[in-house]
C-alpha cells in the first residue's frame, strides 16, 4: 500500500523548528536591510564619481568601492540565508500532516520508492544479490541487501572503497554533492541509510497473500471465484482456463455416481472365459443395465472423414500470471452495472413477494460485498492487477541491522533471512528460465518464489511457517507490525512522551466520579515546572537549582514523614494540582472513552486510584492493569479536558447511547460482601434491636460483627410478612399472661395484642444489610415517587413503561448543558461508611436534589 500526504499552507511547525526558522528569517531581514542601506550609499557615491568623470583614485571612489564590496558581501549573506531558509522549509515535519490516505501501491510507485538518482545522473536502488556483507572485509556487498551504492554510505562522508573522504563546500559554504569515481557511492551523511529504500524486480509476479488468504478473500470476491480455486492456481497445482467449457463439467456429460466414475476410468477390454461368466452371473440386473447403457458412451469412435476440424480457442495458464491476466481483463464499470442490475432485481423481488429465501439472501450479500469492493477500486483509481506484485520493496538497512558479536559472529534480524530467501529463488528462477528448463521445474520454482514472498509478508499465514536453524518461526513484516509488541502499539501508540507517567490502577473507594487518585511522587515529577515557578513566586527558593534540590529531598524523605520545608513543597504541589485536569488513558484506545479527564487527588503510595464506575468505558479491571497519565499544557487543552473529556460528562456509550457508567468491579464485590451471611461466626441470634440506628451504633462500637445475624424491629412491610403460607405455618406461637401472642417464623416475628391487632414485628437480618438499607434510604431520597411520576405522565401521557421513562431521561440528559448533566442524573460513586469498613456506597453530594429534578422536568416543554 502507498500513502499520500496532504499538507496545509502555511505549514505548522514544532516550537524548535519555528524558533530556528524565525532566527534565520530575522538574520535574512537584517542582512537585507543592511544591504539596502549600503546600496543607497553606494548609489549616492556613484553619482558623485560619475559627475567628476575622472579616473583618479579619489576618496569618494575608494569609499564607493568599499561600500560596493560590502553590498556584495551582504548580498551573498542574504543569498546564503535565503538558501538555508528554503532548505529548512523543505524539511518534512509530522505537524504538517493534514490527513493520510492509504491505497494499493502500483509497481511503478514501488520502483520509485527504491530508485534514487545520484549527482552523476546514474539511477540506483535495485537489489540483485542475496549477500549482506563481506565476511573478510566486513563491508557491505555491492548490489546486495546492505549495498552502499543503493542505500548510502556506512560512514559519514566516506565511500565504499575509502579513496574518497570528507566533504567539499562551495564559496557559500554549501556541501557539494560528490560520487566516488571508483565505487560509485555518493558521499553524504550515513543517517540516510535509515530511510532510503530499495526494491527487488521479480522475474515472475506473485500474488499478495493478504488479498488471497484474508477473510473474506478480496481476490475471490472480485473475481467471483472460491478461494481454494485461486489458491490452486496461485501455487501451481491447477490450471486456469481463459473461458469455461462443458468439457470441464463431468457432471453434465456423465451424470453418474462417484463409484461408477471410478469404474469408468479403470475400464479395460478383456475376454471372459466360462469361469468368469459363471462368476459374474450373480451381478444385479441394475448393474448390468448401467454398464450396458454407459458402455456405449465410453467406447472409442473414429472421426468420420469430411467433418470440419477446428482448434480449441481456450488457453491455459498457471501461477500468479494467470490471476493477473484475469484481473487485467476485468472491466470494473461493466461489472458494476451488471451487479447493480442483479441487486435491483433481488430487492424488487423481496419487496413484491415478501422475505427472500436463505439462498437468495446469501446471493444478495455476496453481490453487495463484490459491488462495494469494485466501488472502492473505482474511487481510489487503483487497478485490480496491482494486487499481484511485480516489484518488491526493500526496507532501509538500518531498520533491519546486522550486528557483529564477540568471536567474529554476526547477529541479524529475521527480515534479512527472508529477503535472502526471496533473492535466491528469484535469481534461480531467472537462470532456469534462460536455460529453457522443463515445465515441471519452472512450475516448482514459481511456487517456491510465491512461498518465499508469502513468508516475507506474513510468515505462517498460509500454513507451515519458515523456520530458522533453531526451529523458531522467522519474524515477518506482519509480525513486526501487529500485536502488543508491534510497531503501532509498542513504538507509536505506546511511546513515551513528555509530561506523562504510567502506573498500576487500584480502586479508590472515597473518590467521586470525576476524580482519580494521583501518587504524590508522580505528581511532583509531572508538575515540576509549575511547582518550581510557584516556589520562586512565593520566594521559598531563590533560584531554579535550589527549588529542584528542595523537591528532590522531599521525594527522598517521602510524603509520610515530611519536614517543615518538605511540607511547604507538598503544599505548593497541592496548590498547583487543585482544579488542574489530567488525562488517563488505557491501551488499547479502541473508542472515545478510552481516554478521559479527571481531577487529581493527591494520595500516598505509587498506584493510581480509579473510580469503579468508569471501568466499563476503559475496559479496565483491578487485576494488574496499567494506565497512562498525561498533562494537558495549553489553555485550550485544559478547557477541552474540563468541558468535554471529564468522566462525569461521558455517561452514555457513544456506540449505543445506553448508560455506560454502571456498577462493576469492587462496587459489586463490596455490596455482596456487605449483604452476605456468614454462619461460621459467633451466633448472635439472641440479640434484638429496637431500631436500625441502634444496630449502627452497636456495630461502630464493635459489639456486633458486619455479618452477625440479628433481630430488628421493623415498622414497614417486609417481604412475605402478609403471605398466607407464612401466617398459616408459624414455627412457634407464644402467648403471655396479658393475652399477647408471638408468631415466630423463620425470617421474622409478629406480635399481636389480645384483640388480634399487630403491635410490632421483628425481621431476621444481618448488620451489613441494615447498613446497606440505611445507605440506600439516606442517599436515594430523590427517587421517583408518586408526585414525580404524575409530573412525568402529565408531560408524556404515553410514557407509562420504564423504557419510555429511560428514553425521557436520556433525552433530558442530551438537552442540557454539560455542567448540569452530572447533577441532573446524580449517578453514584463508591465510598465507605467509615474508615476501614469494607462497603461501597454512593456519597450524598453526587446526587441531585428532588427540587432540581422537578425543575428539569418542567423545562421539558422548551423543546
Curated annotation (Swiss-Prot):
It is an enzyme of class 2 (transferase). Zn(2+) binds at residues 159, 161, 180, 183. Belongs to the RNA polymerase beta' chain family. RpoC1 subfamily. InterPro entries: DNA-dir_RpoC_beta_prime, RNA_pol_asu, RNA_pol_N, RNA_pol_Rpb1_1, RNA_pol_Rpb1_3, RNA_pol_Rpb1_3_sf, RNA_pol_Rpb1_clamp_domain, RNApol_RpoC1. Binds 1 Mg(2+) ion per subunit. Binds 1 Zn(2+) ion per subunit. Gene3D superfamilies: 1.10.40.90, 2.40.40.20, RNA polymerase II, clamp domain (4.10.860.120), RNA polymerase Rpb1, domain 3 (1.10.274.100). Its EC number is 2.7.7.6. It is found in: Plastid, Chloroplast. Residues 23-36 have a biased composition (Polar residues). It comes from Nephroselmis olivacea (Green alga). It comes from the Eukaryota. GO terms for biological process: DNA-templated transcription. DNA-dependent RNA polymerase catalyzes the transcription of DNA into RNA using the four ribonucleoside triphosphates as substrates. In plastids the minimal PEP RNA polymerase catalytic core is composed of four subunits: alpha, beta, beta', and beta''. When a (nuclear-encoded) sigma factor is associated with the core the holoenzyme is formed, which can initiate transcription. Keywords: Chloroplast, DNA-directed RNA polymerase, Magnesium, Metal-binding, Nucleotidyltransferase, Plastid, Transcription, Transferase, Zinc. Residues 1-83 are annotated as: Disordered. This is DNA-directed RNA polymerase subunit beta'. GO terms for cellular component: chloroplast; DNA-directed RNA polymerase complex; mitochondrion. GO terms for molecular function: DNA binding; DNA-directed RNA polymerase activity; magnesium ion binding; zinc ion binding. Its main location: plastid. Mg(2+) binds at residues 621, 623, 625. Its cofactor is Mg(2+); Zn(2+). It catalyses: RNA(n) + a ribonucleoside 5'-triphosphate = RNA(n+1) + diphosphate.
Amino acid at each position: 500500500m502507498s500513502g499520500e500526504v496532504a499538507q496545509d499552507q502555511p505549514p505548522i511547525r514544532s516550537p524548535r523548528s519555528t524558533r530556528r526558522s524565525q532566527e534565520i528569517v530575522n538574520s535574512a531581514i537584517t542582512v537585507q536591510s543592511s544591504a539596502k542601506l549600503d546600496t543607497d550609499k553606494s548609489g549616492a557615491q556613484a553619482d558623485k564619481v560619475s559627475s567628476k568623470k575622472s579616473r583618479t583614485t579619489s576618496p569618494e571612489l575608494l569609499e564607493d568601492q568599499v561600500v560596493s564590496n560590502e553590498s556584495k558581501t551582504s548580498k551573498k549573506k542574504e543569498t546564503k540565508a535565503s538558501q538555508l531558509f528554503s532548505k529548512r522549509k523543505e524539511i518534512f515535519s509530522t505537524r504538517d500532516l493534514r490527513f493520510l490516505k492509504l491505497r494499493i501501491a502500483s509497481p511503478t510507485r514501488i520502483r520509485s520508492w527504491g530508485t534514487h538518482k545520484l549527482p552523476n545522473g546514474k539511477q540506483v536502488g535495485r537489489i540483485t544479490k542475496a549477500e549482506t556483507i563481506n565476511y573478510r572485509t566486513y563491508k557491505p556487498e555491492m548490489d546486495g541487501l546492505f549495498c552502499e551504492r543503493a542505500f548510502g554510505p556506512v560512514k559519514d562522508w566516506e565511500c565504499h572503497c575509502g579513496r574518497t573522504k570528507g566533504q567539499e563546500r562551495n564559496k557559500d559554504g554549501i556541501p557539494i554533492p560528490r560520487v566516488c569515481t571508483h565505487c560509485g557511492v555518493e558521499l553524504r551523511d550515513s543517517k540516510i541509510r535509515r530511510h532510503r529504500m530499495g526494491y527487488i524486480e521479480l522475474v515472475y509476479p506473485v500474488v499478495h497473500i493478504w488479498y488471497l488468504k484474508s477473510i473474506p478473500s478480496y481476490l475471490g470476491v472480485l473475481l467471483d471465484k472460491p478461494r481454494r480455486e485461486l489458491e490452486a492456481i496461485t501455487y501451481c497445482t491447477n490450471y486456469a482456463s481463459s473461458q469455461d467449457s462443458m468439457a470441464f463439467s463431468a457432471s453434465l456429460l456423465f451424470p453418474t455416481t462417484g463409484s461408477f466414475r471410478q469404474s469408468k476410468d479403470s475400464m479395460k477390454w478383456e475376454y471372459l472365459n466360462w469361469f468368469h461368466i459363471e462368476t459374474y452371473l450373480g451381478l444385479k440386473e441394475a448393474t448390468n443395465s448401467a454398464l450396458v447403457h454407459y458402455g456405449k458412451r465410453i467406447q472409442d469412435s473414429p472421426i468420420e472423414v469430411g467433418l470440419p476440424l477446428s482448434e480449441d480457442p481456450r488457453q491455459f495458464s498457471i501461477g500468479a500470471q494467470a490471476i493477473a491476466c484475469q484481473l487485467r481483463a476485468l472491466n470494473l464499470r461493466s461489472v458494476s452495472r451488471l451487479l447493480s442490475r442483479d441487486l435491483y432485481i433481488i430487492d424488487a423481488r423481496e419487496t413484491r413477494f415478501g422475505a427472500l429465501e436463505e439462498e437468495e439472501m446469501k446471493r444478495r450479500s455476496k453481490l453487495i460485498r463484490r459491488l462495494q469492493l469494485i466501488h472502492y477500486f473505482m474511487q481510489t483509481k487503483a487497478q485490480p492487477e496491482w494486487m499481484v506484485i511485480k516489484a518488491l520493496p526493500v526496507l532501509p538497512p538500518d531498520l533491519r541491522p546486522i550486528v557483529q558479536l564477540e568471536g567474529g559472529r554476526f547477529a541479524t534480524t529475521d527480515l534479512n533471512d527472508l529477503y535472502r530467501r526471496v533473492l535466491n529463488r528469484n535469481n534461480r528462477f531467472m537462470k532456469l528460465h534462460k536455460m529453457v528448463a522443463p515445465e515441471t521445474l519452472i512450475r516448482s520454482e514459481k511456487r517456491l518464489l510465491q512461498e518465499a514472498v508469502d513468508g516475507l509478508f506474513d510468515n505462517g499465514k498460509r500454513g507451515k511457517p519458515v523456520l530458522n536453524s533453531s526451529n523458531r518461526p522467522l519474524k515477518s513484516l506482519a509480525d513486526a507490525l501487529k500485536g502488543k509488541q508491534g510497531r503501532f502499539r509498542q513504538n507509536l501508540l505506546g511511546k513515551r512522551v513528555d509530561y506523562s507517567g504510567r502506573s498500576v490502577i487500584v480502586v479508590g473507594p472515597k473518590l467521586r466520579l470525576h476524580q482519580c487518585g494521583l501518587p504524590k511522587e508522580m505528581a511532583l515529577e509531572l508538575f515540576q515546572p509549575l511547582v518550581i515557578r510557584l516556589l520562586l513566586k512565593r520566594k521559598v527558593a531563590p533560584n531554579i537549582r535550589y527549588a529542584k534540590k528542595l523537591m528532590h529531598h522531599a521525594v527522598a524523605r517521602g510524603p509520610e514523614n515530611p519536614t517543615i520545608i518538605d511540607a511547604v513543597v507538598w503544599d505548593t504541589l497541592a496548590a498547583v494540582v487543585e482544579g488542574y485536569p489530567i488525562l488517563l488513558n488505557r491501551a488499547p484506545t479502541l473508542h472515545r472513552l478510552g481516554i478521559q479527564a479527571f481531577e487529581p487527588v493527591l494520595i500516598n503510595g505509587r498506584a493510581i486510584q480509579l473510580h469503579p464506575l468508569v471501568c466499563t468505558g476503559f475496559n479496565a479491571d483491578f487485576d494488574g492493569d496499567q494506565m497512562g497519565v498525561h498533562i494537558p499544557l495549553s489553555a485550550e487543552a485544559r478547557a477541552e479536558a474540563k468541558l468535554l473529556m471529564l468522566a462525569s460528562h461521558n455517561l452514555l456509550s457513544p456506540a449505543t447511547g445506553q448508560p455506560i457508567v454502571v456498577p462493576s468491579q469492587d462496587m459489586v464485590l463490596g455490596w455482596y460482601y456487605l449483604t452476605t451471611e456468614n454462619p461460621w461466626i459467633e451466633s448472635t441470634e439472641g440479640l434484638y434491636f429496637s431500631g436500625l440506628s441502634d444496630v449502627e451504633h452497636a456495630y461502630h462500637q464493635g459489639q456486633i460483627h458486619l455479618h452477625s445475624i440479628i433481630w430488628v424491629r421493623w415498622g414497614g412491610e417486609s417481604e412475605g410478612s402478609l403471605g398466607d403460607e407464612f401466617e398459616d405455618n408459624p414455627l412457634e406461637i407464644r402467648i403471655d399472661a396479658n393475652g399477647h401472642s408471638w408468631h415466630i417464623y423463620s425470617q421474622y416475628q409478629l406480635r399481636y395484642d389480645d384483640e388480634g391487632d399487630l403491635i410490632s414485628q421483628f425481621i431476621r437480618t444481618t448488620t451489613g444489610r441494615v447498613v446497606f438499607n440505611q445507605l440506600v434510604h439516606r442517599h436515594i431520597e430523590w427517587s421517583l415517587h408518586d408526585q414525580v411520576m404524575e409530573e412525568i405522565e402529565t408531560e408524556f401521557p404515553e410514557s407509562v413503561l420504564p423504557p419510555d421513562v429511560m428514553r425521557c431521561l436520556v433525552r433530558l440528559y442530551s438537552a442540557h448543558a454539560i455542567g448540569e448533566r452530572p447533577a441532573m442524573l446524580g449517578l453514584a460513586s463508591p465510598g465507605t461508611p467509615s474508615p476501614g469498613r469494607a462497603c461501597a456506597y454512593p456519597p450524598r453530594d453526587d446526587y441531585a436534589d428532588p427540587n432540581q429534578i422537578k425543575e428539569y422536568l418542567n423545562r421539558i416543554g422548551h423543546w
